[in-house]
């Protein structure tokens, strides 16, 4: 028997990329149905047959007015809800109807975003080696990752990872996972897809559960996709952001701050009032741990991509860190135009940032700054922190077709 001619260490070295994982393309998609926030309280209380709850409707109007959301996109239409009245109750068995929607529509919406990312990337789909699919809704087997592989015509040997029920922090999670995959598999090109549809969480109002109504005022549907790879071939690939470091942590004394429970009535959502306080109280520690190795202490000198869980979170983070209003411009734009799309939000914000940076004539994809931070906040209370490095903008770059 012949002896091996290489060592394990040599094999491992050959498997690893040389440079950092890099975002090479971004695509986004929404359902066609657009809901304007100013009209939503009347619509919501009418479709749920709750117009007799006049005081509660006034509270909901105030929630919508304070949300800083202008419009959202939702797959659920009035016609579908009229055909499924149990989905309009606060607590009525409706999981089957919800599942029938999301197991079909989540991969379909993800496909629309993935098509845009792949088109911008400009390389053959056969070069995609890994697929990471994330959604808060629609657990099924085989999963949305399998369905998307078939829909896109990816290679049967693509390495798939399906992430269900993570929640709003998961836009950071998928980038952290994609970074590890790209940097530890030389030549890997990772397709990351976050697809979120609120059909699992929609429900009627309850006077005893105002936290559920907060979700009804904030959540919207959307999907985003990115291509991630290390050592890009800059003759045919256009780097957008480098993923420099990534970490996850559970905030102290935050158990029960954000919960979701999948039941016969769908996915119930529970929120404590002090979520903005918990996040702002701990945000400086996350920033210090991420940026101390870089010698960065001025957080107005970096670009910001923060999950827009709601305006109060953004307001309190700005106040705690002393941020100038411009730093959250891309984040607040996505909140205004799409609402809270859970895991997909931060990828929408990256897309908005690189496009706006190019349109404004900035020197880099990160609003002219070299370094940036991406935060995901969600159940746990869990925080994902990703350190980003922008790239110089060349003529025509950083804007998708």
UniProtKB/Swiss-Prot annotation:
SS bonds (residue pairs): none
GO molecular function, one term: naringenin-chalcone synthase activity
Catalytic activity annotation: (E)-4-coumaroyl-CoA + 3 malonyl-CoA + 3 H(+) = 2',4,4',6'-tetrahydroxychalcone + 3 CO2 + 4 CoA
Pfam family, one: Chal_sti_synt_N
GO terms, biological process: flavonoid biosynthetic process
Pathway assignment: Secondary metabolite biosynthesis; flavonoid biosynthesis
UniProt-recorded name of the protein: Chalcone synthase 5
Lineage: Eukaryota, Viridiplantae, Streptophyta, Embryophyta, Tracheophyta
């Amino acid at each position: 028997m012949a002896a091996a001619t290489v060592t394990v260490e040599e094999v491992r070295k050959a498997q690893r990329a040389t440079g950092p994982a890099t975002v090479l393309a971004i695509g986004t998609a929404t359902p066609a149905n657009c809901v304007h926030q100013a009209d939503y309280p009347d619509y919501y209380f009418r479709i749920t047959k709750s117009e007799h709850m006049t005081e509660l409707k006034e509270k909901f109007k105030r929630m919508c007015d304070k949300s800083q959301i202008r419009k959202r996109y939702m797959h659920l239409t009035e016609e579908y809800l009229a055909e499924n009245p149990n989905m309009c109750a606060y607590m009525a068995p409706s999981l089957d109807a919800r599942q029938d929607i999301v197991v079909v529509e989540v991969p379909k919406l993800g496909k629309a975003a993935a098509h845009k990312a792949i088109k911008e990337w400009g390389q053959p789909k056969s070069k995609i080696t890994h697929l990471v699919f994330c959604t808060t809704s629609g657990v099924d087997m085989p999963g949305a990752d399998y369905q998307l592989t078939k829909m896109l015509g990816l290679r049967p040997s693509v390495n798939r990872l399906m992430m269900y029920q993570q929640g709003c922090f998961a836009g950071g999670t998928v980038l952290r996972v994609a970074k590890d995959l790209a940097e530890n598999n030389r030549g890997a090109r990772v397709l990351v897809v976050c697809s979120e549809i609120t059909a699992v969480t929609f429900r009627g109002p309850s006077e005893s559960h105002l936290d559920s109504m907060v979700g009804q005022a904030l959540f919207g549907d959307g999907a985003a996709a990115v291509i991630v790879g290390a050592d890009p071939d800059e003759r045919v690939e256009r780097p957008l952001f480098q993923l420099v470091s990534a970490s996850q942590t559970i905030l102290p004394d935050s158990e029960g701050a954000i919960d979701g429970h999948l039941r016969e009535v769908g996915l119930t959502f529970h929120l404590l009032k002090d979520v903005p306080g918990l996040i702002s109280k701990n945000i400086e520690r996350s920033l210090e741990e991420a940026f101390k190795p870089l010698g960065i202490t001025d957080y107005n000198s970096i670009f910001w991509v923060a999950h827009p869980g709601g305006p109060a979170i953004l307001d309190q983070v700005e106040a705690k860190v002393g941020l100038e209003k411009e730093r959250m411009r891309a984040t607040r734009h996505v909140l205004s135009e799409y609402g809270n799309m859970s895991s997909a939000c931060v990828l929408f914000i990256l897309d908005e940032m690189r496009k706006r940076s190019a349109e404004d004539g900035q020197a880099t994809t990160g609003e002219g700054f070299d370094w940036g931070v991406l935060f995901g906040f969600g159940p746990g209370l869990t925080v994902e922190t990703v350190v980003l490095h922008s790239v110089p903008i060349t003529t025509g770059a950083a804007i998708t077709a």
